[in-house]
Structures are given as C-alpha cells and as structure tokens.
A protein has these predicted regions:
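Intrinsically disordered, acidic Ser/Thr/Pro-rich low-complexity regulatory segments
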Residues: 75, 79, 85-344
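N-terminal helix-turn-helix
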Residues: 16, 26-81
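Generic N-terminal leader/targeting and pre-domain segments
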Residues: 1, 82-83
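Short, locally clustered residues in the helix-turn-helix/winged-helix DNA-binding domain
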Residues: 17-21
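Short alpha-helical segments that sit at the start of domains
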Residues: 1-14
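Alpha-helical hairpin
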Residues: 4-5, 40, 69, 87
Length: 344
C-alpha cells in the first residue's frame, strides 16, 4: 500500500480502478457515489479524485469528465490483491478438464497450456518451454521406419523431445541401432545434455564399435542442442488484443504483434520480468514503450527444484488482474505437476 494516501483516498482509488476494469469507461464521482458505499458526497469524492490525480494515481482523459488509473494507480490496486485468491470451482474444473482431455504426451503440455491460459483469461498467453541444453537426458529410442531408415527420439526429463529420421548405413541393422540406444542410455542417464563430455562420447563409441552408427547417435544429440539455448516459445490468444477497447488503434496493435513475432525479443522480455513467485509489470514499468499500455503477469515453473521455464499473461493495463493472477498461479502449479507425472 502507498504511504502517502489516507484511508479515504485508498477506498476511492480502489473503487476507481475496480470500476474502470469492469466498465472500460472513465469513472466520475457520481458513479462512485451511486455504486460504492463510500459514505461521502459526490463533491467530496470529486475533490479527493483531484488530489489523487495530482499525486499521480489517476489521469484525466481530455474527452471525458471522468478519470482513469495511471500505472501508479494500477500498482496500488495490484499490490492490494495479495495474497492471491484461490480459483473458483468452475475455473478449477475447466483447467483440470482441459489437461485431461487434451494432453497425452509431455510435448503437448506447453502448447495446450498456452491455449488454456488465453482461453480462460481472454488475454495473450506466453509459455516458454524448458531449455534443451539444461534438461536432463532421459532416453534415446529408435523406431523402425523402413528397411533403410529409423526414427530417433531423444527425450529429456523436462519434456523436450527431438525427433529425427536417420539413415541405417549399409551393413548395419535396426538391431545395431537398438544396441546403440542402450549404450547411450546407460552412459548419459541422469546427465544434463550440456554436461555431456568427450569421455562420455568415447564410452559410447567403444560400446557401439561401429563408427557410422556412433556418428548417427552424435548427430541426434547435436540436433537436440542446436539453436536451443532457450526453450521453444508458445503463444496463445493474440487475436484477443483486438477485443480490448484500448487496442482499437491498429498502429498500436501492429507494433505489439511485430514484437510478439520476434521470439528473441519476447524471450528477453520474459527473462526480464521473471522472478520468484508471481510478478506483475504494469504499463510504464515496462522498458519498451510498445507495452506502456499493457501489463505482463509472469510466473516461473520448477521441477525437482530446477527452474524450467516461464508462463505469462499479456493484456491491457485494464486487465482483470485478480482473475489473471489466480489463473496463472493455479495453472503454474498444475503445469509443474503435469510435467512431473508425464516424464516418468
């Protein structure tokens, strides 16, 4: 809470933010007097709102007699929402049904999480999947494709999966590749992909014996790491931007979409905003002016104490913070549990 506000100003500011989030219309003193039990006259409310504007908590649009919250006003409101309220029974049921009906494999979790968050919050969702290089090797498996080819499947504990078609060299058999998978699994089990050493590779080569088959194994692991310093980014609900009154300016929306199309920029934003627990970055707290009319809510997810990735909601500064925060917090817990269950 802000120390420069007395209790009456806090009540009025809270009411202004709450009403503006619900209505998207500038809030006047008469509206507050009618809808909220403040126990004071519209004239007194009007004077207090003028003080709140002078203190930087409210802004006065030129085309309206009412006022809207500033980034500072929203910050007051969001800080007052702690601790986060639990999800409703209906929200909980939808989240559980979504995962139950749509997720069968670990590699489906992240895309469906992005779709779920966007669907429930009606905002843009961002899900940063685990980094391949930091993931712990789980298993290399080969599946027969035809006489001359097999499908190599590399899996990690964090849900990363790399599929690649490999050629079976002349003189080799599918059984040779199965033997090679056994040697790789025995040597690398429980080891981070980025920690694989030359000594590990020598052990695998010695166990396999055949140089051409060994090269195929190394190529699969190299492919898994190539360009994967960060995990894959999943977006959901970008069309939701146009449903908000704040984003009827097409130039503003176009600028946001251009940034969202740049995976490297979005990952930088998520890394900047991510912290312990739930982090809310509001309006002009964002470094990029493209998002000065937007807010990010981010959360990091962990398995076995290891940081795996980030999930986030992007919406207008007028977003329904209470709902978005409780949804993201609950989905974050379920995502962690889902990864843990499906990795075994």
């Amino acid at each position: 809470m802000s120390n420069d506000l007395d209790e009456r100003k806090r009540q009025i500011l809270w009411a202004v933010v709450d009403d503006y989030i619900a209505s998207a219309e500038p809030v006047g003193s008469r509206t507050l007097a009618q809808k909220y039990n403040l126990g004071i006259s519209p004239a007194t409310i009007r004077n207090e709102m003028a003080d709140l504007e002078m203190l930087g908590y409210l802004e006065h649009p030129h085309t309206s007699a009412g006022r809207v919250p500033s980034s500072k006003g929203y910050r007051f409101y969001v800080d007052g929402l702690q601790p986060i309220a639990p999800v409703t029974d209906a929200e909980k049921a939808k989240i559980h049904d979504w995962y139950k009906g749509r997720v069968r494999r670990l590699d489906e979790v992240f895309q469906e999480t992005a779709r779920l968050i966007a669907d429930v919050t009606h905002n843009v969702s961002l899900v940063l999947a685990p980094q391949a290089a930091q993931s712990t090797f789980r298993m290399l498996q080969f599946l027969p494709l035809d006489l001359g080819h097999a499908i190599a499947v590399l899996m990690t504990d964090a849900g990363f999966v790399e599929n690649r078609i490999v050629e079976i060299p002349d003189g080799a058999t599918f059984a040779d590749f199965q033997r090679m998978a056994g040697a790789v699994n025995q040597t690398l089990s429980g080891k981070a992909l980025c920690a694989v050493t030359k000594q590990d590779l020598r052990r695998i080569r010695d166990a396999i014996g055949d140089e051409s088959i060994f090269v195929a194994a190394v190529e699969v692991m190299h492919r898994a790491l190539e360009g994967r310093e960060d995990g894959r980014l999943y977006l959901g609900g970008t069309a939701q931007l146009l449903s908000n009154p704040e984003f009827q300016d097409l130039d503003r929306v176009r600028a946001m979409l251009l940034v969202l199309e740049r995976e490297d920029l979005v990952k930088d934003i998520l890394h900047t905003h991510a912290g312990e627990g739930l982090t809310v970055t509001i309006g002009r707290e964002n470094e990029s002016s493209t998002f000065w009319d937007s807010s990010f809510i981010t959360a990091t997810y962990h398995v076995d104490g290891k940081l795996l990735g980030t999930i986030a909601v992007l919406g207008p500064t007028r977003m329904e913070y209470a709902k978005a925060m409780r949804i993201l917090d609950y989905v974050n817990t379920n995502l962690t549990e889902m990864i843990y269950q499906l990795k075994w």
